[in-house]
């Protein structure tokens, strides 16, 4: 896989065959090339990768169904990835709080 475009789903086997750093680099290159201003390109790319990883795994039906629903409701695939990533970011933030438990909701 030589390029990433969030408008097109990566082929799962090709995506998962990449090293995590390669995935982050591909996503970062897309955003730099598209001249999308971001406060933290690395964090943004990492959340894109986390969502794409879930979409590529066969057992992550809920994530795939959610992404498809968001697209049916009118979001672009890129914006739908952002929507899923925003939920993930909130959960990560919650888990980083003192006393948080990974088993909470």
What does each model-found stretch correspond to?
Residues 1-105:
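Structure-specific DNA junction-binding interface
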């Amino acid at each position: 896989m030589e390029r990433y475009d969030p408008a097109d789903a990566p082929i799962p086997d090709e995506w998962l065959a990449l090293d995590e750093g390669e995935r982050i680099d591909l996503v970062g290159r897309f955003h730099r090339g598209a001249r999308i201003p971001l406060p933290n390109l690395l964090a943004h790319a990492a959340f894109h990768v986390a969502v794409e990883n879930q979409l590529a795994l066969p057992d992550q039906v809920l994530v795939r169904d959610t992404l498809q629903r968001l697209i049916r409701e009118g979001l672009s695939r890129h914006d739908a990835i952002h929507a899923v990533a925003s939920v993930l970011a909130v959960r990560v933030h919650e888990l980083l709080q003192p006393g948080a438990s990974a088993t909470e909701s």
